[in-house]
Amino acid sequence: MIYIDNRQNKIKVNEELENKIKEIIDYALKEEKVNIDYEISVVFIDNNSIKEINKDYRNIDKATDVLSFPMLDYEDGEVFKDIYLNYEFDESDLDEGNLVLGDIALSLEKAEEQSKEFGHSFLRETCYLTIHSVLHLLGYDHMEEDEKVIMRQREEEILKSFNLHR
């Protein structure tokens, strides 16, 4: 189950965008071997809202593009398919039968700014940020160079499957 909640009014959100976000999340999770019913919440916000969240959770007082709040625990360098592929989740891990993977806060205002800066479509930038965040929910990171290379490769592979190039 993918929940999308638009809490901003600076960028128009249409059904096409919401459907593409859901489609790309579902595809990424299948590619990453998430073989259980799941729940992810995506909240579209503006720069002011994401700045507040970034300050509250990361002590960084500036707007960013996307923030991820994973619900599962991962050891350094391990991802969902390494740990949870055949894991037996019990009822306390589930919400109405769905594994809660986490929440995504995405600034559509920042996505629009970055799409212009990088010279590609708003849809491509929003999908990229969504995939980036979903991979964080699955344990991927980019703090170390070797992890960054792996994460960027997965992002690009998923984007190419949707014909979304830079």
UniProtKB/Swiss-Prot annotation:
One of its GO terms (molecular function) is metalloendopeptidase activity. InterPro entries: MetalPrtase_cat_dom_sf_prd (IPR023091), YbeY (IPR002036), YbeY_CS (IPR020549). It comes from the Bacteria. Its main location: cytoplasm. Zn(2+) binds at H132, H136, H142. GO terms for cellular component: cytoplasm. Belongs to the endoribonuclease YbeY family. This is Endoribonuclease YbeY. It comes from Clostridium botulinum (strain Hall / ATCC 3502 / NCTC 13319 / Type A).
